[in-house]
Design a protein with these regions (language model features):
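Fold-independent oxyanion-binding glycine-rich loops
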Residues: 10-14, 19-20, 34, 55, ...
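A generic structural motif
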Residues: 81-83, 248-253
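Short beta-strand
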Residues: 240-244
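DPxDG-like acidic metal-binding loop motif
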Residues: 92-118, 134
Length: 316
């Protein structure tokens, strides 16, 4: 029986820009996908019984995604050999498990010669965990329990992110956000503010919303480094700060100019230099053991015809 090979990636996140509960009871988050993630290479062939080998310890959701995808798309059973690599640590709020699920599902579909669109991948991910919305190549408002977008925007800002990664971790599956319900009116307002920000092409409003949500989240998951990062954000002239609402990582946000701006390349390079300088500053002032890195969120571009082109700059 012939082996068939599939290769795919899944984007990670720097936490979320916003996360909470709306007045209609839906849990939501505004995604912060980044250009770091997981990669899966797998080979499969028909077999008399299921066998999945090569999945690293602690990555059980990856195995579930691979097998569930194969069962859903083609039945099975299959023998599957997996090679997995990831830039994302577990328990930090970097979207590691969702990135694994995305990479595993897409690689399996690719090996089978089939495609899974974003909505189908989202539904599969939500059947395995309360997922991030990083299967969509953009900033969206997402219901991770139902696996469906709440808002898909016709514009979103792009950020250079200085990612601060403490050594501590959290069991993200154990965090209970039902206590956020009394604050639902505030979260309704934040989502409405983002709708207005999209209409006005106001990227700064996304950064401000992220900072407000980070501060509200201190009531539920205390991040001991938020105060420090807020002070450094003001000192360094960054546009905002965000956190992993169910993890430990934080981000300092630098709004990148639109690719359509005059002299866009020079302006974007200047912001990236500022972000790099901020990363060096944070490495100097933060205690040893807090890792500091750089990432970026997906770019938005509009074609000359005015249609949305989300594939112009892939995450990988």
């Amino acid at each position: 029986m012939t082996w068939r090979v599939g290769v795919a990636t899944g984007a990670g996140t720097c936490g979320e820009l916003v996360q909470g509960v709306l007045s209609d009871g839906r849990s939501f988050h505004v995604t912060c996908p980044i250009n770091k993630g997981s990669r899966v290479v797998l080979a499969l062939r028909e077999s008399r019984q299921w066998r999945v080998e090569g999945v690293p310890a602690g990555r059980q959701k990856l195995e579930r995604a691979i097998r569930l995808t194969a069962e859903t798309l083609a039945g099975g059973p299959y023998e599957i050999n997996v090679e997995h690599s990831s830039e994302l640590e577990v328990g930090k709020g970097l979207g590691s498990s969702t990135a694994d699920i995305l990479a595993g599902a897409r690689a399996t579909a690719s090996a089978l010669g089939l495609n899974m669109d974003e909505d189908r991948v989202a539904a599969l991910a939500a059947s395995i965990e309360v997922s991030d919305g990083s299967m969509y190549p953009e900033i969206i408002t997402f219901d991770g329990r139902a696996g469906v977008p709440i808002r898909r925007y016709d514009w979103w800002p792009q950020f250079a992110v200085v990612l601060v990664n403490p050594t501590t971790s959290i069991d993200t599956d154990s965090v209970d956000f039902t206590d956020q319900a009394p604050l639902s009116a505030q979260y309704d307002r934040i989502v409405a503010d983002l709708d207005l920000a999209v209409a006005e092409r106001d990227g700064g409003a996304f950064a401000r919303a992220a900072g407000e949500s980070a501060r509200l989240n201190q009531l539920f998951v205390m991040n001991p480094w938020l105060d420090v990062l807020e002070r450094e954000t003001e000192r360094l002239g960054a546009d905002g700060v965000n956190v992993a609402h169910t993890g430990t990582c934080l981000g300092m946000l630098f709004l990148l100019p639109a690719a359509t701006d005059a002299h866009a390349t020079e302006k974007i390079d200047a912001v990236r230099r500022r972000a790099s300088s901020a990363a060096r500053r944070l490495r100097a002032v933060l205690p040893d053991g807090l890792r500091v890195g750089l990432a970026e969120t997906p770019v938005w571009r509009e074609s000359r015809a005015g249609s949305l082109d989300v594939g112009a700059d892939p995450l990988y």
